[in-house]
Amino acid sequence: LVPAAVFQEKQKAELLAFTFSSPEGRCLSNELKDEPAELVFGVDEDVYEFCSRSLVNPRFVHHVGPLLSLWKKQSRARLPRQLYVVLHRRRMDVACYAQGNLLFVNSFEYEHADDILYYILYVWKQAGMDQQKDQLRLFGDVPLRSEITNTLRNYLQYIDPLEIPSEAYLMGSEVLQAPLDLIALSL
């Protein structure tokens, strides 16, 4: 995530290489419509080439971009700070908001439930969140979510499942089977 004030298109590959020791092939970026920032990311060169020649004007979107827009909108209506966590297979996305203001965003790889607990509690502490009033919103595999929620309740007062936005239900029941980032992209 690069602040819009310092982002320059010609330097995005350098920024990606600085942030990641081995960035993926093609360097791309997405302007975040709700934040004064640009999301810089890498895409496998073969995937990029295949999509570019097989699709008409493909649009490449980082999976976190639509989630950030969704969470910003949700957090504006909430007084306490929100820590949003989406659990994927071996990766988790984490973002912290205070009344619509993005405080933190990152993705972490994990192998065990303990890794998830560590990252959540570490980000919670670093963001200066209050254990008694701020909220953790979790989305992902239900058994894994239940397992970590039981432990997190020893440390945090408000832990809720992250619900699929109500607008998604208007698109039909099949949409509910899609990953959250695809649902957020369609809203």
Where are these regions (language model features)?
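Hydrophobic/aromatic-enriched cytosolic interaction surfaces used to assemble or bind macromolecules
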Residues: 1-187
